[in-house]
């Protein structure tokens, strides 16, 4: 099958001069090595390829474009293909909100031993920008980058010369650097002290909350980016983790510690998990460790998001919620269900500063 891929069972049986049912049984007994395509032909999984291109009609690729591309192709975490190509098209820039999800998806695929390639051949500018963001420092070493993986960047040099970009920093329980402090320093350098303490606090809470619900060996990360949009400066902060996710770790604690909340949001009802996340953001107090032991982080984050008139989106394994704040209060909330699989918690925090 290495020389002649995509053969049907009867064709393989004919070549080997054996019964077709023997071939079929062998193939189904070894699905970790073989896969059947849409034409019922069999091939080695490592030769079965899926390409996902993150296309966008405008300049910036956002998390919405990422989600549309996954909806179009399906999550590669659920597909039968052993070889996944994630492609960045020409003449497009990648916002951190999209870069974080591409990075998380690639690392999750590498964790399950898929052959993964990131294709920047049509967009060297995006590759260069993401290099400055330390994207490739966070990328699993087994992932191939086209046309080639950049050499390691000079961390101190980038930190000193890039005030509008905080590179994707690892979230570690015992790290060399305090990530929220690094955000605050960069924010003050670029924009003065306005809102710097609020940003520091909200991101500290979000990062702490993600750490509490992680339970994974894949390192999480956070980053801060600013860009000009229609006469104002837009700030995008991301916190991304590939663990179990907030909802998955809260659920087991509800029946034991918060039965009234469990009754309010039964898993059998549609959108129940999304509503649970919104409830935690608005009311706080929920913790996998029980009452009075943490659980205030999401509510505190919501309060500071309101003070910044921010938009917050929280992506879980198969759904997301979005909370939009105006006039320092929650203006609206929404959710999207049935999203393609992406493990963990992926938070995007956006707000504007008028010049």
Provide a role label for each language-model segment.
Residues 2-8:
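Short capping segments at the starts of secondary-structure elements
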Residues 93, 181-204:
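Conserved short strand/loop->alpha-helix "switch" segment adjacent to the catalytic nucleotide/phosphoryl-transfer site
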Residues 103-105, 194-230, 302-305:
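Conserved ATP-binding N-box helix of the HATPase_c
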Residues 11-13:
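A short acidic, leucine-rich amphipathic alpha-helix
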Residues 209-253, 258-259, 333-336:
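ATP-lid-like helix-loop hinge signature
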Residues 24-49:
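Charged low-complexity interaction tracts in eukaryotic proteins
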Residues 47-78, 140-142, 248, 252-259, ...:
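Flexible, glycine-/charge-rich segments associated with ATP-binding catalytic modules
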Residues 25-26, 50-140, 337-355:
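N-terminal assembly/transducer modules of large multi-domain enzymes
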């Amino acid at each position: 099958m290495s020389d002649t891929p995509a053969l049907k069972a009867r064709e393989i049986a004919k070549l080997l001069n054996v019964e077709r049912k023997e071939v079929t049984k062998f193939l189904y007994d070894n699905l970790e090595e073989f896969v059947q395509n849409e034409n019922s032909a069999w091939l080695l999984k490592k030769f079965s390829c899926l390409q996902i291109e993150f296309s966008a009609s405008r300049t910036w690729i956002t998390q919405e474009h990422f989600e549309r591309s996954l909806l179009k192709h399906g999550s590669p975490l659920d597909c039968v293909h052993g070889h996944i190509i994630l492609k960045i098209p020409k003449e497009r820039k990648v916002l951190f909100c999209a870069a974080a999800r591409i990075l998380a998806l690639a690392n999750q695929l590498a964790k399950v031993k898929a052959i993964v390639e990131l294709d920047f051949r049509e967009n060297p500018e995006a590759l260069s920008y993401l290099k400055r963001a330390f994207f490739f420092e966070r990328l699993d070493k087994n992932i191939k980058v086209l046309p080639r993986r950049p050499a390691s960047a000079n961390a101190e040099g980038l930190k000193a010369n890039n005030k509008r970009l905080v590179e994707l920093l690892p979230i570690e329980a015992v790290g060399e650097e305090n990530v929220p402090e690094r955000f605050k320093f960069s924010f003050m350098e670029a924009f003065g002290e306005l809102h710097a303490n609020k940003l520091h606090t909200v991101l500290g809470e979000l990062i702490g909350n993600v750490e509490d619900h992680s339970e994974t060996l894949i390192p999480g990360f956070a980053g801060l980016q600013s860009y000009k949009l229609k006469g104002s400066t837009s700030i995008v902060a991301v916190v991304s983790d590939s663990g179990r996710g907030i909802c998955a770790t809260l659920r087991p604690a509800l029946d034991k510690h918060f039965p009234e909340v469990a009754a309010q949001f039964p898993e059998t009802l549609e959108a129940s998990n999304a509503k649970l996340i919104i409830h935690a953001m608005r009311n706080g107090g929920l913790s996998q460790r029980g009452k009075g032991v943490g659980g205030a982080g999401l509510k505190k984050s919501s309060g500071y998001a309101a003070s910044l008139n921010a938009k917050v989106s929280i992506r879980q394994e198969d759904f997301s919620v979005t909370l939009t704040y105006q006039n320092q209060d929650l203006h609206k909330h929404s959710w999207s269900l049935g999203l393609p699989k992406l493990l963990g918690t992926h938070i995007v925090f956006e707000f504007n500063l008028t010049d």
